[in-house]
């Protein structure tokens, strides 16, 4: 990988040399979506400072310089800041005046374009506006922009993810369908790679969701986990008796039953946690939010989960870069 750097006017200055960069990108509230970069003082161009860009063409890894620390004992200068994905966390989606929600309805890329319009000094652009064939219909109220985009796209008519790519001096965004790679990319010990697998403990399979009201007037919904992983009001005999595990969700301000159901499921799934897998690679084999499979032979842990975080560690000696990728699945 080759990383180009600029001045604060985004004019290219050259290729990073004699440096190391640690990136973490991924799902909102799972990944930090930031980076730390150390450069040999002798290789540092003083025009490369706060507000400058660095990036790898045709991929997501890059960011804007922010914090800076000089360590003369190590003969290095360290920069910290947000990745391009992390910059989306700097904004919140608020409802229009006089309305309870911002209603995101229509073709996905058009909606994304509307949400970022007038922000990020035109560094961010949206590709294929009106052309994705992905429809969204999602109500947003005071959500972090990255969080809102992830949730909106996941609930689209075609479950989707936000793709971020840097090229032509711009950060390009677009909605693309989530891909199930669990059969194609199914990792096990035979790969000869380092794996850490963790299976979640017994999960909640019943929700008591309480909304607005008092006593018998209070909104109350019982939801049951189904065999396909969805929730509805039909009891599932598979999770009866000792196998029943109930989560109580209490939101005394919610008067919309459909919103109560949605938020109670979200809270329960967060409380449940997910199966976890950490794998180390030297190449980038899959995209954020795609599904991959895992089987750990010693314990027999086996599951299919989304990639929710990527860590990239880059060491650049001269101009030769050595890369190590780590994937995390689950929350």
Give residue ranges: language-model regions.
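Short polybasic amphipathic segments
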Residues: 1-8, 52, 172-173, 206-208, ...
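Solvent-exposed edge beta-strands and adjacent loop segments
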Residues: 1-28, 188-197
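Oligomerization/assembly interface segments of phage tail-like spikes and tubes
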Residues: 23-41, 75-87, 209, 269-284, ...
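Surface-exposed cap/loop segments at beta↔alpha junctions
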Residues: 42, 47-125
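Short beta-strand and beta-hairpin "edge-sheet" elements
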Residues: 53-80, 163-164, 190, 295-324
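Short beta-strand-centered interaction patches in the first periplasmic/extracellular domains
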Residues: 69-79, 83-88, 128-204, 208
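Extracytoplasmic/secreted envelope proteins and their assembly/folding machinery
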Residues: 109-113, 146-150, 206-207, 261-265
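Acidic, small/polar-enriched beta strand-loop surface segments
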Residues: 179-317
């Amino acid at each position: 990988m080759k990383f180009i750097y600029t001045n604060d006017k985004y004019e290219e200055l050259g290729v990073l040399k004699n440096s190391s960069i640690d990136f973490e990108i991924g799902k909102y509230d799972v990944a930090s979506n930031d980076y730390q970069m150390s450069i040999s003082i002798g290789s540092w161009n003083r025009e490369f400072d706060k507000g400058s860009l660095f990036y790898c063409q045709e991929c997501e890894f890059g960011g804007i310089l922010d914090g800076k620390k000089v360590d003369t004992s190590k003969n290095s200068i360290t920069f910290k800041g947000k990745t391009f994905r992390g910059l989306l966390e700097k904004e919140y989606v608020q409802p229009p005046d006089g309305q309870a929600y911002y209603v995101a309805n229509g073709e996905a890329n058009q909606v994304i374009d509307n949400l970022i319009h007038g922000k990020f000094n035109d560094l961010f652009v949206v590709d294929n506006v009106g052309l994705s064939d992905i429809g969204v219909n999602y109500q947003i109220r005071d959500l972090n922009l990255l969080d809102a985009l992830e949730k909106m796209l996941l609930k689209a008519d075609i479950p989707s993810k936000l793709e971020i790519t840097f090229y032509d001096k711009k950060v390009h965004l677009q909605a693309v369908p989530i891909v199930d790679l669990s059969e194609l990319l199914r990792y096990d010990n035979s790969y000869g790679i380092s794996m850490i697998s963790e299976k979640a403990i017994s999960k909640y399979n019943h929700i008591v969701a309480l909304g607005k009201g008092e006593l018998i007037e209070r909104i109350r919904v019982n939801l049951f986990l189904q065999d396909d992983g969805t929730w509805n009001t039909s009891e599932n005999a598979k999770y009866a008796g000792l196998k029943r595990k109930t989560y109580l969700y209490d939101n005394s301000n919610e008067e919309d039953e459909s919103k109560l159901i949605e938020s109670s499921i979200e809270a329960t799934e967060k409380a449940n946690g997910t199966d976890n897998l950490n794998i180390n690679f030297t190449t980038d084999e899959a995209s954020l939010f795609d599904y991959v499979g895992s089987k750990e032979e010693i314990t027999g842990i086996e599951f299919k989960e989304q990639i929710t975080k990527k860590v990239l560690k880059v060491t650049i000696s001269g101009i030769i870069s050595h890369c190590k990728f780590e994937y995390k699945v689950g929350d």
